Amino acid sequence: MTISDELLEQARDILYTPVISDTLDSMGLLSQALPPTVRPLDENLVLCGRARTGLYMPLYHDNAELDVYEHEIALVDDLKPGDVAVFSCAGNSRIAPWGELLSTAAHARGALGCVTDGLVRDVRMIREMSFPVFAGGI
């Protein structure tokens, strides 16, 4: 199902988290809330868009042949207007996938924000950009 940009814009203007959560519950889609550790860097910003997902895995050894940023950069380069980067770190509190550089790149492509259960770097700069980021820690 494709959701139009117009409908997403209306959702950003009208809907809020409790309405969405209660509606999903009434549809039998229970427990759809973010974990309590994932918090906005700026509680005044709203985030609603199409999810573009990525999964991070811990790397426990150095491998010169492995480009650990290849897929992350490709995902950010492919973001479209209205997209939200959603990066799962599988609850690992040692992974910090998002920062000011990716926020700047995502914003330049028209992306609306980022959600990650991982850590975030460059918090002051991201806040100054007013770029919505929800993260598992800083």
Locate each region found by the language model.
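Feature captures the catalytic cores and cofactor-binding loops of soluble hydro-lyases/lyases
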Residues: M1-I138
